[in-house]
Amino acid sequence: MSVDNFRLDGKVALVTGSGRGIGAAIAIELGKRGANVVVNYSRAVAEANKVVETIIANGTKAIAIKADVGEIDQVAKMMDQAVEHFGQLDIVSSNAGLVSFGHLKDVTGDEFDRVFRVNTRGQFFVAREAYRHLSVGGRIILTSSNTASIKGVPKHAIYSGSKGAIDTFVRCMAIDAGDKKITVNAVAPGAIKTDMYAAVAREYIPGGDKFTDEQVDECAAWLSPLERVGLPADIGRVVCFLASDAAEWVSGKILGIDGGAFR
């Protein structure tokens, strides 16, 4: 297989929630491989503009578009704008999401709705609009989690459930999207060192609120036989593979990316 099959030259990608963290890394990695990129954000405008600057500095084109993925009309408008600006849309990576922790007895209806609005409903309609806007042979890449179906986590039912739905979406959407030769897959990250990593990682560790940042790192790294914590670029590189011609026969799959932590 030619290495060119991993390039994305001439492609246009849109990444939701890409102003920071994993989404930013996905957008930057797509740009490094030749794609022009739409950087979506909801509130982090300054951060999104920095991601755009980085992509442009690396040699491709990029724009930032504000949209709340929980609002269907905004999602549709964002993709209209992407096609209007670049003339096409080939790759949609749905990354925007919320995290939530809470014991079963304490979870409110408002919290349930807040999380499912973005993580589940939002991703469904991002995928729907992606299907409607993508060129034939396009790519839809959703975001699940390694807590969705592999391992239960205390006080994490709402988040894990919201991501578990993604696994089912992917399997069914891959069938529906086949008529446009569009592949549908998901990445399921484990512990990834983003700007919110230290605070969130403590929730997974019994007594983690008493751990130093270094101890949190050690604990997360211990779970992986590779003995390190994941980085946003680890996710970005896998998304780039799924977006490339090299993955044209991969569809309906959920790829766990956790360094072998859950096995």
Swiss-Prot record:
Q: Where does NADP(+) bind?
A: 22, 68, 95, 128, 159, 163, 192, 194
Group of enzyme by EC: oxidoreductase
Which superkingdom heads the taxonomic lineage of this protein's source?
Eukaryota
Which cellular compartments is it found in? Answer: Cytoplasm, Cytosol
Q: Which GO terms describe its cellular component?
A: cytosol
Going by the UniProt record, its keywords in alphabetical order are: Cytoplasm, NADP, Oxidoreductase
Q: What happens when the gene is disrupted?
A: Blocks the production of dothistromin and accumulates versicolorin A.
Which Pfam families does this one have?
A: adh_short_C2
Broad class of the protein's primary localization: cytoplasm
Asked if the keyword NADP belongs to this entry, the reply reads yes
Q: In which pathway does it act?
A: Mycotoxin biosynthesis
What does it do?
A: Versicolorin reductase; part of the fragmented gene cluster that mediates the biosynthesis of dothistromin (DOTH), a polyketide toxin very similar in structure to the aflatoxin precursor, versicolorin B. The first step of the pathway is the conversion of acetate to norsolorinic acid (NOR) and requires the fatty acid synthase subunits hexA and hexB, as well as the polyketide synthase pksA. PksA combines a hexanoyl starter unit and 7 malonyl-CoA extender units to synthesize the precursor NOR.
- UniProt-recorded name of the protein: Versicolorin reductase 1
Taxonomic lineage of this organism? Eukaryota, Fungi, Dikarya, Ascomycota, Pezizomycotina
